[in-house]
């Protein structure tokens, strides 16, 4: 989860998030080198008199500053496209769970367990226990298994929402009248937090998501312990 004054990304809990962190570092390195090169060129131009007003063209230089950026863009685009297609893959999910956004709470439906349905509301500050996180705790957590592909079917009943858990690398829009899906495989047990990431009205900031990831064997006993 996130920590105060944190500068980096949250620890990955899924292969997709691990790939996103690697790509972030890859792209950040490329952008840092480009920024340093541009700043060096600007500084050199301002502090030296290495100018020549008689030069009308420099085809070699123009070729370099056309081909080099193109190569850099390709090196950034390929890993980006790989992750993009990886997030869209749906390969025989073991479980399907439906998430419905409302103003301003979530409804979860376990379609593989007799259609178990429950709502998940944010806990008001008066109901928090010592150690609980303000604006992030809910009354009913969504319980998910680890080490098994899970498909989340996400939609909305009223306005646009977005079901997001950063540590899993998940962010899927909940659109009224449309059913979006995302598949993920969690790798570590724990409790992970997210929030609605689409401005959805006055209480948009009070619409948290809490996922409790547990071993597959325990999950297969039935998700009734979420209530």
UniProtKB/Swiss-Prot annotation:
- Per UniProt, Cu cation A1 binds at 161, 196, 200, 207
Q: Where does Cu cation A2 bind?
A: 196, 198, 200, 204
User: Which parts pass through the membrane?
Assistant: 15-45, 60-87
Instruction: Please state what class of enzyme this protein is.
Output: translocase
Sorted alphabetically, the Gene Ontology cellular component annotations on this record are: mitochondrial inner membrane; mitochondrion; respiratory chain complex IV
Q: Which residues lie on this side of the membrane: Mitochondrial matrix?
A: 46-59
- Single Gene Ontology BP term? ATP synthesis coupled electron transport
- Explain how, and how many, cofactor molecules are bound: Binds a dinuclear copper A center per subunit.
A molecular function annotated in GO for this UniProt entry is: cytochrome-c oxidase activity
Q: Where in the cell is it found?
A: Mitochondrion inner membrane
Q: Which residues lie on this side of the membrane: Mitochondrial intermembrane?
A: 1-14, 88-227
Catalytic activity reads: 4 Fe(II)-[cytochrome c] + O2 + 8 H(+)(in) = 4 Fe(III)-[cytochrome c] + 2 H2O + 4 H(+)(out)
Q: Which domain of life is it from?
A: Eukaryota
Cofactor(s) needed by this chain: Cu cation
A Pfam family that the UniProt record links to this protein: COX2
Q: How does it assemble?
A: Component of the cytochrome c oxidase (complex IV, CIV), a multisubunit enzyme composed of 14 subunits. The complex is composed of a catalytic core of 3 subunits MT-CO1, MT-CO2 and MT-CO3, encoded in the mitochondrial DNA, and 11 supernumerary subunits COX4I, COX5A, COX5B, COX6A, COX6B, COX6C, COX7A, COX7B, COX7C, COX8 and NDUFA4, which are encoded in the nuclear genome.
Similarity annotation: Belongs to the cytochrome c oxidase subunit 2 family.
Functional description taken from the UniProt entry: Component of the cytochrome c oxidase, the last enzyme in the mitochondrial electron transport chain which drives oxidative phosphorylation. The respiratory chain contains 3 multisubunit complexes succinate dehydrogenase (complex II, CII), ubiquinol-cytochrome c oxidoreductase (cytochrome b-c1 complex, complex III, CIII) and cytochrome c oxidase (complex IV, CIV), that cooperate to transfer electrons derived from NADH and succinate to molecular oxygen, creating an electrochemical gradient over the inner membrane that drives transmembrane transport and the ATP synthase.
Under what name is this protein listed?
Cytochrome c oxidase subunit 2
The record lists the lineage as: Eukaryota, Metazoa, Chordata, Craniata, Vertebrata
UniProt lists the gene as MT-CO2
């Amino acid at each position: 989860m996130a920590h105060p004054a944190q500068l980096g990304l949250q620890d990955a809990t899924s292969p997709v998030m691990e790939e996103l962190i690697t790509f972030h570092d890859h792209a950040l390195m490329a952008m840092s080198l480009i920024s340093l090169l541009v700043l060096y060129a600007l500084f050199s131009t301002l502090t030296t008199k290495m100018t020549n007003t008689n030069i009308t063209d420099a085809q070699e230089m123009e070729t370099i500053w056309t081909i080099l950026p193109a190569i850099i863009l390709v090196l950034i685009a390929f890993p980006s496209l790989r992750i993009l297609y990886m997030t869209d893959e749906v390969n025989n999910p073991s479980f399907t769970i439906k998430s419905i956004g409302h103003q301003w709470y979530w409804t979860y439906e376990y379609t593989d367990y007799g259609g178990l349905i429950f709502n998940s509301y944010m806990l008001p500050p008066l109901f928090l226990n010592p150690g609980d996180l303000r604006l992030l705790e809910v009354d009913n957590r969504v319980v998910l298994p680890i080490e098994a592909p899970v498909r989340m079917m996400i939609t909305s009943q009223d306005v646009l929402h977005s079901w997001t858990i950063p540590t899993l690398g998940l962010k899927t829009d909940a659109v009224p009248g449309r059913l979006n899906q995302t598949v993920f495989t969690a790798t570590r047990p724990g409790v992970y937090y997210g929030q609605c990431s689409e401005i959805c009205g006055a209480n948009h900031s009070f619409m948290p998501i809490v996922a409790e990831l547990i071993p597959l064997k325990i999950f297969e006993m039935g998700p009734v312990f979420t209530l």
